[in-house]
From Swiss-Prot:
Belongs to the FBXO45/Fsn family. PROSITE patterns: B302_SPRY. Residues 61-253 form the B30.2/SPRY domain. CDD domains: F-box_FBXO45, SPRY_Fbox. This is F-box/SPRY domain-containing protein 1. The lineage of its organism: Eukaryota, Metazoa, Ecdysozoa, Arthropoda, Hexapoda. GO terms for cellular component: cell cortex; neuromuscular junction; nucleus; pole plasm; SCF ubiquitin ligase complex. Signal peptide: none annotated. InterPro entries: B30.2/SPRY, B30.2/SPRY_sf, ConA-like_dom_sf, F-box-like_dom_sf, F-box_dom, FBXO45-Fsn/SPSB_families, SPRY_dom, SPRY_FBXO45. One of its GO terms (biological process) is negative regulation of synaptic assembly at neuromuscular junction. The keyword NAD does not apply. Component of an E3 ubiquitin ligase complex composed of hiw and Fsn. Pathway: Protein modification; protein ubiquitination.
Length: 255
């Protein structure tokens, strides 16, 4: 019979040790034995709480931006998948919360940003929340590292080449390789995007498709035949001082 005092002591020791390890080390630790796996599998444990509180900006934890990710571990994961301050237009900066980009009011420029982590395998979903005016063009979707992040004029930059795929929320058009691929979603009088709505982007690297959801309603497959390349969450914007947030959710739930 296991001594409950000894078990509690062991738990507390592991908690302290794991709190001081780097996240990559925690991933390795979870593969050591079943006991450690179950310990770290608790996504609201004090270990994940400690890492979350020490790595995430306090501003993001106090807001409702992360309301779709309920555990400390998923909040932490979302932070490491957020917009990259090193992979965006020079006219864009990432706000202190770590999840929201701000486009500076630069005339005759279209500006884009990519997420920190791209995907080549598996199924992934993330939320995009446009928190400022859309302007004449506002596009959400995906791109490879080769896609441009800035250009002259007010254009649909995301979807303007063969390295990016986007949905223009202003006109409800799908864009790729500089061409309009059709209307989306395929509904009569499809409602336009309202500022503040959460759109879920669903990338399936196994079926090579990109889809979207709005208000928990699946809008259908937008793009098929995506290439076997690493693809990154991306948006492009034209309106000065507009802001766009992105929260990675993980594997999409079916049904």
């Amino acid at each position: 019979m296991v001594d409950p005092v000894a078990a509690l002591c062991n738990y507390n020791v592991l908690e302290v040790i794991f709190s001081y390890l780097e996240l990559d080390d925690l991933s390795h630790c979870s593969q050591v034995c079943k006991s450690w796996y179950h310990f770290l599998n608790d996504e609201n444990s004090d270990v994940w709480r400690w890492h979350c509180l020490n790595k995430l900006p306090k501003e993001s934890l106090k807001s409702d931006l992360l309301s779709s990710v309920s555990t400390y571990k998923t909040k932490l994961r979302a932070y490491f998948h957020a917009w990259s301050p090193n992979d965006c237009s020079r006219n864009v900066y990432i706000k202190p919360n770590g999840f929201t980009l701000h486009r500076n009011p630069v005339a005759q420029s279209t500006d884009a940003a990519r997420g920190k982590i791209g995907f080549r395998h598996g199924r992934h979903t993330w939320e995009v929340i446009w928190e400022g005016p859309l302007g004449t063009v506002a596009v959400i979707g995906i791109s490879t590292k080769e896609a441009a992040l800035q250009c002259h004029g007010y254009v649909a930059l995301l979807g303007s080449d063969d390295q990016s795929w986007g949905w223009n929320l202003v006109e409800n058009h799908l864009l790729h390789n500089g061409d309009m691929q059709g209307s989306y979603p395929l509904l009569n009088n499809a409602p336009k995007y309202q500022v503040g709505e959460r759109i879920r982007v669903i990338l399936d690297c196994e079926d090579n498709t990109l889809s979207f959801e709005k208000n928990y309603e699946f809008l259908g497959v937008a793009f098929r035949g995506l290439p076997d390349k690493k693809l990154y969450p991306t948006v492009s914007a034209v309106y000065g001082n507009t802001e766009v947030s992105m929260v990675y959710l993980g594997t999409p739930l079916d049904g």
